[in-house]
């Protein structure tokens, strides 16, 4: 067997149909594009939201401004006024607030706000305090202690940038 004897298997290669090249081809006149109209013409079709000339839905909806911050941190909020009946010997922590059902979710940071009055000295540990809450706690003789909160971010990354894989490392 020599190179000039090599042939593809019988029936494995079909000739491509040349459209619009005579009646024998079976694809004459409109060339498989149907009747006339925008879809029969060359070039890209109408834009994605095109509705045949009527005012499209996208234009009829109210215009949305701004953006959604994907790094936003939501807090469980507790007002100073809800700590009035709290025993002074017990520290106020996210765990004790959860046990007394003043907060619902334990995986969220806690912020203390200054709505209401506080008349006993309390040691309050939270992730964030409003300025008025801190002022009311310290005026009552208590302490406002900040806790650190480590935010769990879910990365969409699948490892290093593939375009940088073959780059020279210096």
Curated annotation (Swiss-Prot):
PROSITE patterns named in the record: RIBOSOMAL_L15 (PS00475)
InterPro entries documented for this protein: Ribosomal_uL15, Ribosomal_uL15/eL18, Ribosomal_uL15/eL18_sf, Ribosomal_uL15_bac-type, Ribosomal_uL15_CS
Keyword entries, A-Z: Ribonucleoprotein, Ribosomal protein, RNA-binding, rRNA-binding
A single GO BP: translation
GO-annotated cellular components: cytosolic large ribosomal subunit
Pfam families, A to Z: Ribosomal_L27A (PF00828)
Signal sequence, start to end: none
Bias-annotated ranges (Basic residues): 13-26
Stretches for region Disordered: 1-50
Compositional bias per record (Basic and acidic residues), positions renumbered to this chain: 1-12
Ribonucleoprotein among keywords: yes
Self-association state and partner proteins as the record states: Part of the 50S ribosomal subunit.
UniProt cross-references to HAMAP family, sorted A to Z: Ribosomal_uL15
Record function comment: Binds to the 23S rRNA.
PANTHER family referenced in this protein's UniProt entry, alphabetically: 50S RIBOSOMAL PROTEIN L15 (PTHR12934), LARGE RIBOSOMAL SUBUNIT PROTEIN UL15M (PTHR12934:SF11)
Similarity remark: Belongs to the universal ribosomal protein uL15 family.
Protein name: Large ribosomal subunit protein uL15
Species the sequence originates in: Chloroflexus aggregans (strain MD-66 / DSM 9485)
Lineage per the UniProt record: Bacteria, Bacillati, Chloroflexota, Chloroflexia, Chloroflexales
């Amino acid at each position: 067997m020599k190179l000039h004897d090599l042939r593809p298997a019988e029936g494995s290669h079909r000739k491509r149909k040349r459209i619009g090249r005579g009646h024998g081809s079976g694809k004459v006149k409109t060339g498989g594009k149907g009747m006339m109209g925008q879809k029969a013409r060359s070039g890209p079709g109408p834009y994605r939201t095109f509705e045949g000339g009527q005012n499209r839905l996208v234009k009829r909806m109210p215009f949305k401004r701004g953006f959604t911050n994907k790094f936003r941190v939501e807090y469980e909020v507790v007002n100073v006024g809800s700590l009035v009946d709290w025993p002074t010997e017990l520290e106020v922590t996210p765990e004790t607030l959860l046990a007394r059902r003043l907060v619902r979710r334990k995986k969220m940071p806690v912020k203390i706000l200054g709505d209401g009055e506080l008349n006993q000295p309390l040691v309050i540990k939270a992730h964030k305090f409003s300025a008025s809450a801190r002022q009311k706690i310290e005026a009552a003789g208590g302490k406002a202690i900040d806790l650190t909160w480590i935010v769990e971010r879910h990365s969409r990354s699948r490892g290093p940038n593939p375009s940088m894989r073959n780059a020279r490392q210096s």
